[in-house]
Swiss-Prot record:
One of its GO terms (molecular function) is structural constituent of ribosome. Keywords: Ribonucleoprotein, Ribosomal protein. Belongs to the bacterial ribosomal protein bL34 family. It comes from Porphyromonas gingivalis (strain ATCC BAA-308 / W83). GO terms for cellular component: ribonucleoprotein complex; ribosome. One of its GO terms (biological process) is translation. It comes from the Bacteria. This is Large ribosomal subunit protein bL34.
Length: 50
């Protein structure tokens, strides 16, 4: 049986990246909350340089 988690960096960035967070009001709320908490990495995009 195939496992449910088949990692792909492209999908990860498209779903959880900075630009997708900025695209919706709720996503911007997530970023604001993470900034307020002092997170070093706001989104998964921060792990990728390019």
């Amino acid at each position: 049986m195939k496992r449910t988690y088949q990692p792909s960096n492209r999908k990860r960035l498209n779903k959880h990246g900075f630009r997708s967070r900025m695209a919706t009001a709720n996503g911007r709320r997530v970023l604001a909350a993470r900034r307020a908490k002092g997170r070093a990495k706001l989104t998964v995009s921060d792990e990728f340089v390019g």
